């Protein structure tokens, strides 16, 4: 396959089915996902503020940092807890125009509270930032793309092992140290 053909294939827009909480129906993020040609479905049963990329198996909970800081901690902690208990591959998308000391403190408290869980925190500044991150994560974890990424990594590793002068030098050093340790063991 020629390089130009591969580039052309990479430019093809990725689309998938996305389930969005009905609470986000009037928000900019829902419209933006629809504008990217994704198949958007709304659900009343999904946790408020949630977006699920069903084919990728990833779920995102959108929360505003200011709202979290002004509400009682147990309210948003309970919401996050419920979310991660339902979704195995979960991300908290924390919106703040600027991530200052208060926002980082909030993220630290959330991180400490959910340490060891399947929750990852994504600090974002705006809708475009959030969309790019969510779509990148969902795309790279979807079946055809994850297989392609794994194949590329295996191919790259094999190339490095076969072609790298550094790797060859390391192998020679290891071989010479193996022969030294074999000689000293006699």
From Swiss-Prot:
The keyword Nucleus does not apply. Homooligomer. Interacts with SHOC1. Interacts with SYCP1 and SYCE3. InterPro entries: SCRE. PANTHER family: HYPOTHETICAL PROTEIN LOC689986, PROTEIN SPO16 HOMOLOG. GO terms for cellular component: chromosome. Disruption phenotype: Mice show a massive germline loss and infertility in both males and females. Defects in meiotic prophase progression and meiotic recombination seen in spermatocytes and oocytes. Meiocytes fail to achieve complete synapsis and show repair of double-strand breaks without formation of crossovers. Testis (at protein level). GO terms for biological process: reciprocal meiotic recombination; synaptonemal complex assembly. It is found in: Chromosome. Keywords: Chromosome, Meiosis. The keyword Mitochondrion does not apply. It comes from the Eukaryota. It comes from Mus musculus. Plays a key role in reinforcing the integrity of the central element of the synaptonemal complex (SC) thereby stabilizing SC, ensuring progression of meiotic prophase I in male and female germ cells. Promotes homologous recombination and crossing-over in meiotic prophase I via its association with SHOC1. Required for the localization of TEX11 and MSH4 to recombination intermediates. This is Protein SPO16 homolog. It holds the Pfam family SCRE.
């Amino acid at each position: 396959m020629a390089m130009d053909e591969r580039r052309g294939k990479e430019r093809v827009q990725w689309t998938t089915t996305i389930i969005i909480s009905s609470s986000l129906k009037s928000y900019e993020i829902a419209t933006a996902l629809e504008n990217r040609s994704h198949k958007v479905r709304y659900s009343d049963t999904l946790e408020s503020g949630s977006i699920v990329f069903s084919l990728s198996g990833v779920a995102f909970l959108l929360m505003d940092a200011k709202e979290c800081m002004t509400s009682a901690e147990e309210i948003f902690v309970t919401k996050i807890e419920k979310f991660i208990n339902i979704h195995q591959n979960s991300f908290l998308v924390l919106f703040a125009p600027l991530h200052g000391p208060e926002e980082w403190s909030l993220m630290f408290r959330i991180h400490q509270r959910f340490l060891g869980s399947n929750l990852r925190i994504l600090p974002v500044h705006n809708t475009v930032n959030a969309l790019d991150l969510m779509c990148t994560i969902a795309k790279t974890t979807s079946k055809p793309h994850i297989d392609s990424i794994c194949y590329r990594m295996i191919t790259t590793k094999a190339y490095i092992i076969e072609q790298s002068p550094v790797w060859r030098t390391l192998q020679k050093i290891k071989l010479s140290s193996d022969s030294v340790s074999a000689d000293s063991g006699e």
